[in-house]
């Protein structure tokens, strides 16, 4: 485990004390309508950053009409600053760098939380080729964003970054993964435009790159050269016209030209092989790491729920940082267990009889009971 607990200096000169990262975890803990921090969110954050080098907070909304989760935090306007400042303080008090993930859901936005706004995405719902049964299949009522709205969204991401700077965060992570707005613009399945924002790979890439450039400009204007800017992406989509490994590698070629501090690949399985494009029979993350070629550090994540899997990922040589989500949901003291070599004490299940320890908001407990794949399973025979 020596690798995991060695320091790393990012391209902007900021040293991260170790290679362990808490992945962004949706907690449904902020106020449903205002995004203000609540006691439920405070309890969830308490203790989970201990021993980690960096903690990436849950997806945080940059503009009204893009909320994909009830209880999603906000970074929209100055009234959000008190809650943002408190979140940063909570993480800093535990000794980790605090990074805010900035997000817009596009067509995945919840219809009952649009705040009177239209649901917008790259294209009208009827033009998309994403299957209705897809995980992000909630396209009903979506219309194509206008040019003015696109420019407004770019500004919203930059403004959210400025709010994060003012709130005392160490950085932001631009959420370009998991089927949300930035990925929707890059995917040929959801972006059917024929203007400057779509039609070819290069034009589909324009919006996510414009968002990144605007965030980097916000950092420059702030004078905070030590402010971390990262970008999260998903490597493939399973449906026709969706993203392939070739698309992802082309995006990486452009991202690594920018003044980024890290890239973060979102995977369900760290060791999964490429399905569409790229080198057959070669792990996605390995292909991505080779393409980056040392120009920017990579965070790897995906199914690392046991000490053995975390150790295997750490020694693979395919990522400079290792992120965990489900493992730290089940083990608040995960970093300590790893550092002390107590791998056999890492829990992979949630004990519903010990709710106070986990600090989950009520809705998260409700989802736990449904056995959803993105959450640690409940301990068998223990459910009350």
What do these predicted regions represent?
Residues 1-384:
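Flavin-dependent oxidoreductase catalytic cores
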């Amino acid at each position: 485990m020596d690798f995991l607990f060695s320091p790393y200096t990012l391209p902007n000169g900021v040293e991260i004390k170790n290679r362990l990262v808490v992945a962004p975890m949706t907690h449904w803990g902020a106020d449903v309508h205002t995004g203000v921090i609540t006691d439920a969110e405070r309890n969830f954050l308490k203790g989970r950053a201990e021993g980690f080098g960096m903690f990436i907070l849950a997806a945080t909304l940059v503009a009204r009409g893009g909320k994909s989760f009830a209880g999603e935090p906000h970074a929209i306007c100055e009234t959000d600053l008190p809650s943002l400042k408190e979140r940063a303080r909570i993480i800093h008090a535990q000794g980790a760098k605090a990074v805010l993930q900035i997000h817009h859901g596009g067509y995945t936005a919840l219809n009952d939380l649009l705040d009177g706004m239209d649901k917008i995405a790259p294209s009208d719902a009827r033009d998309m080729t994403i299957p209705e049964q897809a995980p992000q299949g909630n396209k009903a009522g979506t219309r194509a964003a206008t040019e003015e709205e696109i420019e407004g969204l770019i500004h919203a991401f930059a403004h959210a970054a400025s709010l994060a700077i003012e709130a005392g965060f160490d950085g932001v992570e631009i959420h370009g993964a998991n089927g949300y707005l930035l990925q929707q613009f890059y995917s040929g399945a959801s972006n059917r435009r024929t203007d400057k924002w779509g039609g070819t790979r290069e034009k589909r890439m324009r919006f996510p790159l414009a968002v990144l450039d605007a965030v980097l400009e916000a950092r420059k204007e702030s004078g905070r050269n030590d402010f971390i800017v990262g970008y999260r992406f998903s490597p493939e989509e399973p449906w026709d016209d969706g993203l392939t490994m070739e698309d992802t590698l082309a995006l990486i070629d452009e991202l690594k030209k920018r003044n980024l501090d890290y890239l973060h690949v979102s995977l369900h399985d760290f060791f999964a092989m490429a399905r569409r494009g790229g080198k057959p029979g070669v792990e996605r993350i390995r292909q991505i790491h080779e393409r980056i070629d040392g120009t920017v550090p990579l965070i790897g994540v995906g199914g690392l729920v046991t000490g053995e899997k975390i150790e295997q990922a750490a020694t693979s040589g395919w990522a400079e940082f290792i992120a965990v989500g489900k493992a730290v949901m089940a083990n608040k003291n995960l970093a300590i267990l790893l550092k002390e070599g107590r791998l056999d004490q890492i829990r992979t299940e949630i004990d519903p009889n010990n709710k106070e320890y986990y600090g989950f908001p009520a809705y998260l407990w409700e989802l736990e009971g449904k056995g959803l794949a993105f959450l640690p399973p409940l301990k068998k025979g223990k459910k009350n």
